A protein has these predicted regions:
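Hydrophobic alpha-helical segments
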Residues: 216, 234, 284-288
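Short, glycine/acidic-rich hinge or "gate" loops at secondary-structure transitions
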Residues: 36-39, 220-230
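PAPS-dependent sulfotransferase catalytic domain
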Residues: 1-193, 259-264, 268-292
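Charged, solvent-exposed alpha-helical segments that act as regulatory interaction surfaces
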Residues: 32-33, 218-222, 237-241, 291
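Short, solvent-exposed coil/turn elements at secondary-structure transition points
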Residues: 98, 122, 196-198, 234-237
Length: 292
């Protein structure tokens, strides 16, 4: 068994990058001080250049990778160790995909997967943040969150794939995405986090992350308390936002990436009808995870 991928998974605009920042400082620094460039230590699964492999296997399929029926056949193959450039142990891999089976092809499996952290966020705030990131109206952003068929394009890295062919990640609706990662048969170590705890209960949450890796994956950290103290300070939202302002951030597709990062933005931004659309659709899951 390989178990070389540790997934950092979330619905878009739910705190994935913040968790990757914490992980990067925890695993890839001596002192726990985070810098934006350290995010290179975690990769994204859904990058177009990965798909060059498909061309070597089946040219006909290669030019149909904008069809999920074709793309899903290669999900697990693309995740195999020799294709992920993970030399030893496991690597951290970002994804916004749902953990689903499409056309009898599961997104991932327990052979490739060492474990995962899943981050969820109040869908009302996700709707606000996604609208800014994707340059959508609030109504269109809410339609994205509530649609079972929602997809986003793979990251536009240099590849042999013609630009008109646009592979997509199957995201689905917010509740289906949450369900797929929080209630499944993927028998691997898993930690479910709330974005709001990452921001407003940070010390406890970072300690939870450290405990998870120590107990579930038997990893020991040197200078643990010093690292935790520095991670708390250096991954402060305003500190990371300042780094983006000074140095830029490659993942910012539309303006700035680190915009506000606060909870309950929806109270000022969304009207009653928009709030009702989200609450009526997601009421059960919102109650389950404490989003009143």
């Amino acid at each position: 068994m390989s178990k070389h991928i540790f997934w950092i998974s979330s619905y878009p605009k739910s705190g994935n990058t913040l968790v990757r920042a914490i992980i990067s400082a925890l695993f890839f620094t001596k002192d726990g001080v985070f810098r934006l460039e350290q995010l290179k230590h975690s990769t994204q699964f859904e990058k177009r250049d990965r798909l060059n492999l498909v061309k070597k296997i089946n040219k006909n399929d290669f030019f149909k990778l904008d069809q999920l029926k074709v793309l899903s056949k290669y999900w697990q193959l693309l995740q195999e160790k020799e294709h992920m450039n993970i030399n030893k142990g496991f690597g951290f891999v970002k994804s916004h995909s749902s953990y689903v089976s499409m056309f009898n092809n599961w997104f991932t499996n327990s052979t490739n997967t060492a474990g995962y952290i899943y981050i969820l966020r109040d869908p009302r705030d996700v709707a606000v943040s996604w609208s800014k990131h994707a340059n959508l109206s609030y109504d269109d952003s809410i339609s994205f969150l509530t649609s079972f068929d929602s997809c986003i394009e793979w990251a536009d890295t240099e590849s042999e794939l013609p630009p008109e062919i646009k592979p997509k990640s199957f995201i689905s609706s917010w509740d289906e995405h949450v369900l797929s990662w929080t209630n499944n048969n993927l028998n691997v170590p898993q930690l479910i986090l709330k974005y709001e705890d990452l921001v407003y209960n940070k010390i406890k949450t970072i300690n939870t992350i450290v405990d998870f890796f120590e107990k579930q994956l038997e990893i020991q950290f040197n200078l643990k308390q010093e690292k935790i103290d520095n991670i708390v300070k250096s991954t402060n939202f305003n500190e990371v936002k300042l780094q983006e302002t000074q140095n830029g951030f490659i993942e910012a597709s539309n303006g700035v990436f680190f915009r506000k990062g606060k909870k309950n933005q929806w109270k000022k931004e969304l009207n009653e009808k928009q709030i009702a659309r989200l609450e009526n659709k997601f009421r059960d899951f919102m109650n389950k995870f404490g989003y009143d």
